A protein has these predicted regions:
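Glycine/threonine-rich flexible loop motifs
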Residues: 94-103, 271-272, 386-392
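Short glycine/serine-rich loop segments
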Residues: 108-229, 404-415
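An N-terminal boundary/leader segment
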Residues: 1-57, 288, 350
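A short helix-breaking turn/cap at a secondary-structure junction
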Residues: 191-276
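Glycine-rich, small-residue loops and helix-cap segments
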Residues: 23, 34, 78, 84, ...
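Acidic/His- and Gly-rich active-site-bordering loop/insert found
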Residues: 56-58, 66-139
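Acyltransferase
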Residues: 24-32, 64, 272-297, 321-327, ...
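Short helix-loop capping/hinge segments that flank enzyme active sites or metal/cofactor-binding pockets
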Residues: 4, 76-96, 253-258, 311-366, ...
Length: 415
């Protein structure tokens, strides 16, 4: 049946769905092309901790059978999807990037995974994560340069999409675990607003910071996967008003767009070439019709964002991973031990004050958008290109400011 000239594994999800619906290719042919690519390059990229081609093909054939029998299919229509190895999967191990959980199979699907399956997405396997989705990296390398980091913690998901193994993958972000890998690997990465995607069945590190996120090679694919994963219905009044009802969403041609260029308190840590690139990009945006662009500064309170994040994050890790630290200390990294021990030194009062400061950031950014009627903020995703080596600590960037503040963040690979 295959008639498209483009290698199928290089199709975006939206393109693949169009080809499948048009009868030009089958879901199985798409999956076979992705499997071939995985077999060709996985030994170099090391993006997968679990992959079973037979399971993937069975899922694809089920979708084709539904199509052939005239049964309606879900939004994903047979598209292959990678799942970060901190989401429960009923039929695959979930090891959280740690030997402590080697071979653990939870026997149920995380809500996000269930939504993917219900939309007839093909769950290909589990992608590499850093240890407990924190700092200590897995084995994945950057597809653009094997001697450089792909970014943590959603490294496998970003690398699998960037290297054309799959068109879509889900990850998480508690600081910069999606925006940073997406930037380093040169693809789209999206962390929606806090709470927009259910976290049931996902590894917990901190209730007020953990976000579900995802990766793609096109902006249309982000929109597609958001509609698959997000909450819906009248039980979520704001979502129901502005997302379920598309008339409540500002459209591309609804001019003018008001955009803020924000350097953020960590601008000084960015490489000069990164600063020059975004300033050049912003100058081009400023010349576009229908866009009003202003350079603004966040309040001085945001100078404390990184300290606040470290304080509440380390404290939460010391609580949630007490069992691993006390009973499996020989199986956890020195880096993770250091985080837990740092958290143990944070008092309850200090933790609560940290949460109060986070709440201040949330309200200040809400006020910032409402008062000034900004539609978007443009800023650097990272401080520069992917650093050399897997164990290099990245320079401070603004990612965690947006995570702390619960606002959506997206990496656009535009320069």
């Amino acid at each position: 049946m295959m008639v498209t000239l483009k290698p199928l594994n290089m199709l975006t999800a939206t393109e693949a769905i169009s080809e499948i619906k048009g009868g030009k290719i089958t879901a199985t042919e798409l999956m076979e092309s992705c499997i071939k690519r995985i077999q060709e390059i996985e030994h170099k990229i090391k993006a997968w901790v679990y992959f079973d081609k037979e399971k993937a093909l069975i899922q694809s054939k089920i979708v084709d059978k539904k199509i052939n029998e005239g049964i309606s299919t879900g939004l994903l229509n047979g598209v292959p999807v990678g799942v970060k190895d901190i989401f429960n999967t009923a039929d695959m191990p979930t090891c959280m990037g740690s030997p402590v959980w080697d071979g653990f199979t939870p026997g149920n699907d995380a809500r996000a995974v269930a939504y993917i399956r219900w939309a007839d997405g093909v769950v290909v396997g589990k992608t590499v994560t850093s240890e407990f989705a924190v700092h200590y990296p897995g084995s994945t390398v950057n597809p653009n340069d094997y001697e450089h980091t792909p970014g943590t913690s959603s490294s496998g998901s970003a690398a699998a999409v960037a290297s054309y193994m799959i068109p879509l993958a889900i990850g998480t972000q508690t600081a910069g675990s999606t925006i940073r890998p997406a930037s380093y690997c040169g693809i789209y990465g999206f962390k929606p607003s806090f709470g927009l995607i259910p976290r049931t069945g996902m590894l917990k590190t901190l209730d007020t910071l953990d976000h579900v996120s995802f990766f793609s090679r096109s902006i249309d694919d982000l929109h597609l996967l958001l509609n698959v994963l997000r909450v819906k219905g009248s039980n979520y009044p704001y979502v129901h008003k502005y997302l379920d009802n598309s008339s409540g969403i500002k459209q591309v041609n609804d001019y003018p767009w008001k955009v803020a260029f924000v350097k953020t308190p960590v601008w000084c840590h960015a490489e000069e070439y990164a600063k020059d690139s975004i300033i050049d990009f912003v100058s081009k945006i400023d010349k576009c019709d229908g866009i009003n662009l202003e350079e603004i500064e966040l309040s001085e309170d945001f100078n404390l964002a990184h300290d606040v994040h470290e304080q509440i994050y380390s404290k939460a890790l010391s609580y949630y991973y007490k069992e691993e630290y006390e009973n499996h200390i020989d199986k956890i990294s020195d880096m993770f031990k250091e985080m837990v021990e740092k958290g143990r030194r944070v008092s309850y009062d200090e933790y609560m004050k940290g949460l109060e400061k986070q709440n201040l950031f949330i309200h200040q950014l809400d006020y910032f958008f409402d008062k000034n009627e900004y539609d978007a903020i443009i800023t650097l995703s990272t401080a520069g290109d992917a650093p050399r080596g897997l164990y290099t600590r990245e320079k401070k960037d603004s990612c965690l400011i947006w995570t702390l503040s619960h606002v959506p963040a997206i990496n656009l690979p535009v320069f």
